[in-house]
Each structure stands twice: as structure tokens, then as C-alpha cells.
Amino acid sequence: MNDILNKEPMEEDYGIEKSLRPQFFNQYIGQDKVKEQLEIFIKAAKMREEVLDHVLLFGPPGLGKTTMAFVIANELGVNIKQTAGPAIEKPGDLVAILNELEPGDVLFIDEIHRMPMQVEEVLYSAMEDFYIDIMLGSGDGSRSVHLDLPPFTLVGATTRAGMLSNPLRARFGISSHMEYYQERDLEEIVKRTADIFEVEVIDNAAMEIALRSRGTPRIANRLLKRVRDFAQIMGDGRVDKAITDKALTILDVDAAGLDYIDQKILRTMIEIYHGGPVGIGTLAVNIAEDRETVEDMYEPYLIQKGFLMRTKQGRKVTQRAYEHLGYVYNEEE
């Protein structure tokens, strides 16, 4: 995939995303349904002087799950401790993290689906009853230690909700699905980022970036950064529609946010398989990508935009894809 359209965070994103991160719900653009629900739950918990129920945030990468976790902590007025599933390799690692929590704190675990099962099992009692029992030592000298924990809120984030075990999923009192962003919301995000970057962006240019951002704020901010470079070197520093079109064309991002590989998938299906159906394994071989990459990185957006559909026989290209790429659509094929 064209790196600029990769929804996973790149090294350059980390510092930038932190500086752009909204602090409270009234600064957070988009995800209105999730925000509305969480605001009610947080206000109710504060009125009862209780900790917020554990929260699961799930959805595709780049949609602001980490940002939402920090907003939750800020709205609660508590500290947040951040870690990731792959970093918690053994129960002792989890115990060390839990032991640092203060009453009411938020513990944010990103990629929670990647925690080892032995760690996950220790987490069950911590989430449900705020205690853990852990074995110390080995053999005849081993002993069980009971550790009481302060009440806390676990916020877990995952791009693979289906990989969570049922016992873990059941312990989250609140589950919030983060969805792809509407173009108008992305336009507002581009404008907000431009203000922080102190770069002038014309309205139609902001919308053009939004339209090509694959419904993802991380990509919108990354595209704005690159277009800003073109505006600085090839223009007068302002980001207008002309410089935006030129920059994104050079960067191989078309009007629908498709990159070279997206187009290659669709063209291969049209030119070789007459639009399909074709099996995902066969398609992956044809475009020289592994099956998982096609399924995880390309297919979801192509389906969401209406260019591709799944059938029992395999994947099929839609009439919209034919028209977008300039092919004549024959319904009988």
C-alpha cells in the first residue's frame, strides 16, 4: 500500500498525533453517536461517585481510539496509564501495571486482542472485582498472593473485536464501535489541523483532502502535511484545490482515495476475470500480495466505497468501479 494511505501509525505520526489530539468531547470532531453515549455514561458515573464501567473501543485503525481513551480520562478528571497488548508478555507485567494505578484511574490497553491468554485470565478478576491472585515462585516453594486493587476503568482498543475471547468481551460494560468518518467531519479535522500547523487551506481544498482520506483522520492529517510541502515549494504556501489536486496526483491518490494497489485489484478483476466472482487467494496471487494484506488493508475500503462486494462464489467488482476506472460496464458479464 502507498504508505501515505496506510491506516496504521507510521513513525512520523506519533508526535504529530499527540500535538493534534483533542482533550475533551467538545473538541473531538466526528463519532457523534459514541461521544453522546460516553458523555451520558461518564456524567452518570461522576454523579454516583463511581468508577466508569470498562470500555471497549473497536473499529478499523486510524479512527481515533487512542484519542478517545485520553478524552475519557480527561472528562473523568483522572490519570491515564497507557500500554499495549503485545507489551504485556506475562502476568507479572500486568501486575506491575495494575499496582501503579490510583483510585479511579483509566488503564488504556491498545491492541488488547494481542494479549497472551495467561495474562488475559489474570485480568478477569481485576476487571470484575478489583483484585488479583497470582502465584509467586515455583515448585514446592510457590505460593498464592492476593492483591486488592483500587477501583479503575479499563479502556481496551482493538481493530479485531472478533479475536477477543467471550469471557474478556463480557467484562466490558460499554462497547463502542468507531466508524469511518463522514467527509464533512474530515473536512473540519483538516481545517483544525491546518490552524494548528498555521497553514492557510481554502475550503474546497480541505474537502478535496477529506474526500481522498479513506474515511480516516490519520490519513487526512498525513495528506495535509504532504500537500503543505507541495504548496510551500510549488506555490505561494496556501493550500488551494489546484495544488491539492496536483500533489495528490503525484502521490498516486485518486479522487476516491484509491492508490495504485487498490486500482490494480479492481483492474485485475475486470480485465482478467471480467469483474468476478474470483477467490481472494487467486486475486492475491495475481497482484503479488499475500491474502491477509488484501483482506485487511485493501478490501474493507473497496467494499465500504461500493467498488467491491463479497458473494458466496467470491469477490465481484461493481458497476461503480467500472465507471470510476473508465471501463464500459456490461451487465451480462
Swiss-Prot record:
Residues annotated for DNA binding in this entry: R291, R310, R315
One annotated GO biological process: DNA recombination
Record carries keyword Signal: no
Region feature Head domain (RuvB-H), mapped onto this chain: 255-333
Residue sites binding Mg(2+) per the record: T66
CDD domains listed in its UniProt record: AAA
Stretch list, region Small ATPAse domain (RuvB-S): 182-252
Any Pfam family the entry gives: AAA_lid_4
EC number: 3.6.4.-
Top-level EC class as recorded in UniProt: hydrolase
GO CC entries: cytoplasm; Holliday junction resolvase complex
UniProt note: domains: Has 3 domains, the large (RuvB-L) and small ATPase (RuvB-S) domains and the C-terminal head (RuvB-H) domain. The head domain binds DNA, while the ATPase domains jointly bind ATP, ADP or are empty depending on the state of the subunit in the translocation cycle. During a single DNA translocation step the structure of each domain remains the same, but their relative positions change.
Role of this protein: The RuvA-RuvB-RuvC complex processes Holliday junction (HJ) DNA during genetic recombination and DNA repair, while the RuvA-RuvB complex plays an important role in the rescue of blocked DNA replication forks via replication fork reversal (RFR). RuvA specifically binds to HJ cruciform DNA, conferring on it an open structure. The RuvB hexamer acts as an ATP-dependent pump, pulling dsDNA into and through the RuvAB complex. RuvB forms 2 homohexamers on either side of HJ DNA bound by 1 or 2 RuvA tetramers; 4 subunits per hexamer contact DNA at a time.
Family (UniProt): Belongs to the RuvB family.
Name the UniProt record assigns to this protein: Holliday junction branch migration complex subunit RuvB
Source organism per UniProt: Lactococcus lactis subsp. cremoris (strain MG1363)
Classification of source organism: Bacteria, Bacillati, Bacillota, Bacilli, Lactobacillales
Gene expressing this chain: ruvB
